[in-house]
């Protein structure tokens, strides 16, 4: 059979076996030949040493499975299999008496499945009217009262039939277990199955009916009565839904683990005197639970993980004018040409990056170099093909043999599991690929692979390529005194923003997975499929990472098959009173201990404490905290690109329908003449008040000036530039100069700006060059030699401030020069943070004593809440000076903006709308907030043009 020709990727030279399973490391076995490996039954685990193989789980097949490729395992209904790795989700790695391979998880069920009386429908119905008859029929109690009177009892440690009430909602009482120390020393993390810890239960020698010995001082009759009274089976209701059984079980069972979250329970209504008190307690519990993802606690909630986005995806609807759909946070996009569909019709495109590729795409002769993309179309009446553009995570070897032996191909299928067929019309430039997709289907699956030509065993495609894999660190949204981080390895560069993680505590029923957030990631070259060790270190002694220095292992066969591997690292704070964010160092080592990759990640902050105090960022950094500034992962790994002054070609054009000449001049509102042509940066509209009422506006470019034009006065004609378009051509340099006009009118706090730049700028040299200090040595900025890169960045910033405040002929604006420099090195994320802080502070200063009126327009704040914002700033006599009114206003705006969300555009837009609603709005005299709104809405087109790596001819296939 073809599977017998698979060579082993293990460096110890294991003999070939009958499937891919030779890559499993059997530690402690004298001869690692699979022909001599015993079947791992529960009895053998009792007799032999269970510490080395304690994660093996026995399952039984519920239907036949015939594989269609050599990496999967054939089995028949009723056959017993032994699962070695179940972290793959849909596919588990298992073996029978002779072979190893992947099996579909839906075709098998755990051997202790009969412990659960739940039906597939999620309901338990059809119960008899006579309760005693139902008990007799289901044999739930059996002869358990006699079992207490028997003197001969025995203890079972790993019999799956002796795991009581945790998996059976009809039996009440927690599972009392003791965990061996060996459980924490296991270096390989198999996430789904729990280590076979001994469970102390008392059972009859002649029957499989058992009762957990939780009441040693209670007589058997009292125990039986208590269980019968509390048992949900003996209620009058005929049927129970799965959610009701979960509630009944949660009420009857005690805590199953001794973690930090053991006391974090959902409040019960009977604990409170009023409905409002219960509602407040429930909301606080929900807020805490959602911010501190404890896997043991939240895993018991079947609805939590299912409501979170996991795989990166986007859905967009386009009309006949075409456009582009880009997958968020990736280099993957679909270009839709104009007239792709008929005029008046639309095309809805769904694009999703799948985490795990099909098994048939990864073997000795082929390996995936991009995620599998799922493309869904709503309209099949199309007139032209689509263009898929993506970046591959591989580079061919430099020698000529690599170019002849291996080729980069695009495969396509109508089903996720295949079969996949090659796509002929592809075009490559560097690591970017463009694929022409014709013969469109409603659902398509596309993937890029490196495929060998003429490769014979023992060679593999890995010897001719440099494949890159991505390691990402995931954790909760807010850190906690005790939480868990997860390291995940992906076979491509599309690490999702959120990741589902499974971990079973002592529960036998499968809990829902927990969603964690991406903290940081890095890509590195993996020379060959091999066992890699992932280590995690903390930079503060107050935080201890369990098994972080020893690391955890990802097996080579998982990397070869492109499977996503998830390793869990518990992290504990030694002193919860000193809880703060810290830095984690991720290290990846090869099989010989050499470092393949390492990078640092700054953790998020703890959950803010509730109270009247502002939850926004502090305006000033304490002096003792200046030495604790740590560069963010973005600043460490970022390579700053070069700003290119080139024409902006993505404009749309419109015909002006009306002549407008303004009596009260506004530098950000255009004046124009009927019949002329105007360029539009985009068709997105901005809402703000005109002379009398709110209107919608386009950002337009007219005769060398950028500003707003009323949307009703423009007829959009398309992307083709008319020949009679007047005025200078819009370039990125001119666009940058135009959008930065309002910056010099914004107020800032220098200490806050200095802190942000020290945390996010990784190279003082690049920063200085962008400011115009090219080729100047470090001594020009500081008198003494500075060792820290953050201090060097601060010295460059200090020099800029001195020159801007000096009385020179050409006085510079500190804010404008700083924002311009940051945009030239593509620090848009840092720019929008600074702009938002500047806008909020400037608004607070401009509004001052009228901030209460603004708060009513924005959030309808009560008088008590307003007093709470002003209380910290009053003097001993309870008075608040008029010159200090900006402080409570700033505190309120920080809190309000945090509630709006992370969209800086929404924050500034809603702030402008709220100011327009005030009596005698300050936007009548202070017009620069309108300019700031133009600035933040023009950043995307500026960045896409100034830092584009595409040549004009590269855009066409």
From Swiss-Prot:
InterPro entries: DEATH_SH3BP4, SH3-like_dom_sf, SH3_domain, SH3BP4_C, UPA_SH3BP4, ZU5_dom. One of its GO terms (biological process) is endocytosis. Keywords: Coated pit, Cytoplasmic vesicle, Endocytosis, Membrane, Nucleus, Repeat, SH3 domain. Residues 312-449 form the ZU5 domain. Pfam families: DEATH_SH3BP4 (PF24094), SH3_1 (PF00018), SH3_2 (PF07653), SH3BP4_C (PF23637), UPA_SH3BP4 (PF23640), ZU5 (PF00791). It is found in: Membrane, Clathrin-coated pit; Cytoplasmic vesicle, Clathrin-coated vesicle; Nucleus. GO terms for molecular function: GDP-dissociation inhibitor activity. GO terms for cellular component: clathrin-coated pit; clathrin-coated vesicle; cytoplasm; nucleus. The keyword Iron-sulfur does not apply. Its main location: membrane. Residues 54-113, 649-719 form the SH3 domain. The SH3 domain mediates localization to the clathrin-coated pits and vesicles. Possible role in regulating endocytosis of the transferrin receptor at the plasma membrane. Alternatively, may function as a negative regulator of the amino acid-induced TOR signaling by inhibiting the formation of active Rag GTPase complexes. Preferentially binds inactive Rag GTPase complexes and prevents their interaction with the mTORC1 complex inhibiting its relocalization to lysosomes and its activation. Thereby, may indirectly regulate cell growth, proliferation and autophagy. Homodimer or homooligomer. This is SH3 domain-binding protein 4-A.
């Amino acid at each position: 059979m073809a599977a017998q020709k698979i060579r082993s990727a293990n460096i110890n030279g294991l003999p070939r076996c009958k499937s891919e399973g030779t890559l499993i490391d059997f530690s402690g076995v004298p001869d690692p030949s699979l022909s001599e490996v015993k079947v791992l039954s529960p009895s053998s685990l009792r007799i032999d040493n269970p510490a080395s193989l304690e994660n093996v789980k026995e399952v039984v097949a519920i239907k036949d499975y015939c594989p269609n490729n050599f990496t999967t395992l054939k089995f028949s209904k009723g056959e017993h299999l032994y699962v070695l790795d179940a972290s793959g989700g849909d596919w588990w790695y298992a073996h029978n008496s002779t072979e190893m391979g992947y099996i579909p998880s839906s075709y098998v069920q755990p051997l202790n499945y009969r412990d659960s009386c739940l039906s597939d429908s999620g309901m338990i119905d059809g119960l008899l009217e006579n309760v005693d008859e139902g008990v007799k029929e289901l044999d739930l109690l059996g002869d358990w009262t006699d079992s207490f009177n028997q003197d001969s009892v025995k203890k079972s440690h790993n019999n799956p039939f002796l795991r009581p009430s945790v998996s059976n909602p009809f039996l009440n009482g927690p599972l009392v277990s003791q965990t061996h120390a060996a459980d924490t020393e296991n270096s390989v993390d198999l996430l789904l199955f729990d280590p076979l810890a001994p469970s102390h239960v008392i059972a009859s020698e002649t029957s499989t009916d058992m009762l957990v010995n939780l009441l040693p001082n209670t007589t058997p009759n009292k125990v039986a009565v208590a269980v019968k009274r509390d048992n949900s089976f003996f209620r009058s209701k005929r049927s129970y839904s799965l959610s009701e059984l979960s509630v009944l079980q949660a009420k009857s069972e005690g805590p199953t683990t001794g973690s930090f979250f053991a006391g974090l329970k959902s409040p019960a209504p009977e604990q409170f005197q009023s409905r409002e008190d219960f509602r407040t307690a429930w909301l606080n519990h929900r807020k805490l639970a959602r911010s501190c993802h404890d896997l043991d606690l939240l895993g018991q909630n079947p609805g939590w993980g299912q409501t979170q986005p996991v795989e990166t995806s986007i859905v967009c609807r386009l009309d006949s004018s075409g456009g582009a759909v880009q997958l968020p946070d990736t280099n993957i996009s679909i270009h839709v040409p104009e007239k792709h569909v008929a005029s008046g019709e639309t095309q809805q495109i769904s694009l999703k990056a799948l985490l795990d590729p099909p098994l048939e795409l990864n073997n000795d002769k082929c390996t995936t170099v991009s995620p599998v993309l799922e493309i869904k179309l709503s309209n099949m009446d199309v007139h032209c093909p689509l263009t898929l553009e993506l970046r591959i995570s591989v580079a061919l070897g430099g020698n000529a043999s690599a170019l002849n032996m291996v080729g980069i191909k695009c495969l396509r299928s109508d089903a996720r599991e295949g079969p996949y067929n090659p796509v002929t019309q592809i075009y490559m430039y560097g690591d970017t690929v463009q694929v022409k997709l014709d013969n469109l289907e409603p659902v398509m699956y596309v993937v890029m692979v490196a495929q060998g030509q003429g490769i014979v065993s023992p060679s593999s495609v890995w010897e001719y390529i440099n494949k890159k894999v991505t390691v990402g660190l995931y954790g909760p949204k807010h850190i906690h005194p005790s939480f868990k981080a997860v390291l995940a390895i992906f076979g491509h560069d599309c690490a999702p923003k959120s990741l589902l993680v499974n971990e079973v505590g002592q529960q036998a029923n499968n809990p829902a997975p927990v969603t964690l957030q991406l903290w940081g990631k890095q890509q590195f070259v993996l020379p060959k499929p091999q066992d890699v060790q992932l280590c995690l270190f903390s930079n503060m002694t107050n935080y201890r990472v369990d098994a972080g220095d020893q690391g955890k292992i990802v097996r080579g066969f998982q990397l070869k098959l492109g499977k996503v591997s998830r390793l869990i690292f518990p992290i504990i704070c030694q002193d919860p009173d000193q809880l703060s964010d810290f830095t984690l160092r991720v290290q990846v080592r090869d099989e010989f201990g050499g470092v393949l990759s390492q990078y640092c990640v700054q953790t998020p902050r703890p959950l803010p404490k509730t109270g009247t105090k502002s939850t926004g960022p502090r305006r000033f950094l304490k002096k003792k905290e200046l030495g604790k500034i740590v560069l963010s992962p973005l600043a460490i790994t970022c390579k700053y690109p070069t700003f290119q002054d080139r024409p902006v070609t993505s404009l749309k054009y419109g015909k002006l329908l009306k002549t407008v000449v303004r009596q009260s001049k506004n530098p950000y509102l255009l004046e124009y003449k009927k019949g002329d042509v105007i360029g539009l940066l985009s068709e997105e509209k901005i809402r703000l008040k005109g002379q009398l009422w709110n209107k919608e506006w386009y950002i337009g470019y007219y005769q060398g000036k950028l500003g707003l034009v009323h949307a009703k006065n423009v007829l959009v004609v398309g992307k083709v530039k008319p020949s009679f378009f007047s005025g200078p051509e819009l370039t990125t340099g001119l666009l940058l100069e135009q959008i930065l006009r309002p910056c010099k009118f914004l107020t800032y706090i220098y200490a806050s700006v200095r802190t942000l730049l020290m945390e996010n700028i990784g190279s003082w040299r690049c920063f200085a060059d962008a400011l115009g200090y090219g080729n100047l040595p470090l001594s020009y900025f500081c008198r003494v030699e500075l060792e820290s890169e953050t201090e060097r960045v601060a010295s460059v910033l200090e020099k800029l401030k001195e020159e801007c405040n000096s009385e020179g002929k050409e006085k510079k604006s500190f804010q404008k020069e700083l924002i311009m420099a940051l945009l030239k090195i593509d620090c848009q994320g840092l720019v929008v943070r600074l702009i938002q802080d500047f806008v909020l502070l400037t608004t607070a200063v401009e509004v001052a004593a009228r901030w209460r009126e603004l708060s009513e327009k924005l959030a309808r704040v009560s008088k008590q809440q307003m007093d709470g914002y002003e209380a910290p700033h009053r003097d001993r006599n309870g008075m608040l000076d008029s010159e200090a009114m900006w402080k409570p206003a700033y505190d309120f705006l920080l809190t309000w903006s945090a509630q709006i969300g992370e969209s800086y555009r929404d924050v500034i837009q809603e702030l402008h709308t709220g100011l327009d609603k005030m009596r005698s709005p300050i936007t009548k005299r202070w017009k620069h907030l309108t300019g700031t709104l133009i600035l933040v809405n023009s950043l995307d087109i500026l960045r896409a043009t100034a830092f584009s790596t595409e040549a004009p001819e590269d855009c066409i296939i």
